[in-house]
A protein has these predicted regions:
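Interdomain "pre-motor" coupling segment immediately N-terminal to P-loop NTPase/helicase cores
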Residues: 10-65
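N-terminal pre-Walker A segment at the start of P-loop NTPase domains
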Residues: 67-92
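Conserved hydrophobic/aromatic pocket- or pore-lining residues that grip, position, or stack substrates
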Residues: 72, 114, 132
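Walker A/P-loop nucleotide-binding motif
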Residues: 97-113
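Conserved post-Walker A coupling segment in P-loop NTPases
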Residues: 97-101, 117-140
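Residue-level preference for the first positions of well-ordered beta-strands
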Residues: 99-101, 161, 194
Length: 212
């Protein structure tokens, strides 16, 4: 029993990046009660850090509202064979770097589904960012003007899941389309991407410029 407790203390210290002196001292001089207290304190600290990490991920994601899959109606949703409802709700697609296009008319819950999937990803420790396409293009243009575009691209590259809402709602000019294309290219096979759109695929060329 004591050996198991000592091993658990060492594991906690490694995960918390604490000195190995703590488990050594506990093992050599601590009583069973003291070891039990230290293990509980370490486990509480790990739990608190995990809670704070999830809160930080949620805040950094930039969701416009809080949505979950609780009570979500799949009545108008058709999932492809490669994606199960469980994969969607448990963020299994993020682990596989799978991309999702949520297509359909306004008002059927595309944004709700995207946010719910993103929030679930955050609770599992995945770094996530949410933007409308217009918002992201404007931000990319601003950062380029300020000379900090590469910093933003680096931040976007570090994400596990990138959600782009309202794909195709507003045409994007040529400069904006080039910036947006670079973000999409950076995401290829390195993270998951969710797009919500009411525009059929054959008309996606109109997203980028009015004259295409």
């Amino acid at each position: 029993m004591r050996d198991v407790m000592n091993a658990d203390i060492r594991t906690c210290c490694r995960q918390l990046f604490l000195s190995g002196a703590i488990p050594d001292l506990c093992e050599q001089e601590g009583t069973p009660k003291q070891a039990e207290f230290i293990l509980k304190a370490l486990q509480n600290e790990m739990e608190l850090r995990e809670i704070n990490k999830r809160k930080r991920l949620m805040k950094q994601a930039g969701f416009p509202m809080y949505k979950t899959f609780d009570g979500y109606s799949y009545g108008s949703v058709t999932l492809p064979p490669s994606l199960s409802k469980q994969d969607l709700e448990d963020a299994g697609f993020v682990e596989r770097h799978q991309n999702l296009v949520l297509y359909g008319p306004v008002g059927i819950g595309k944004t709700h589904m995207a946010i719910a999937a993103g929030i679930k990803a955050c609770t599992l420790g995945y770094k996530t960012k949410f933007f409308t396409v217009t918002e992201l293009v404007l931000k990319l243009a601003k950062e380029r003007k300020n000379g900090t575009l590469e910093k933003l691209r680096s931040d976007l590259k570090s994400q596990d899941l990138l959600i782009l809402d309202e794909w195709g709602y507003v045409p994007v000019d040529r400069d904006g389309s080039q910036l947006l294309f670079r973000v999409i290219s950076d995401s290829y096979e390195s993270k998951s991407l969710i797009l919500t759109t009411n525009l059929e695929f054959s008309k996606w060329g109109s997203i980028f410029t009015d004259d295409q």
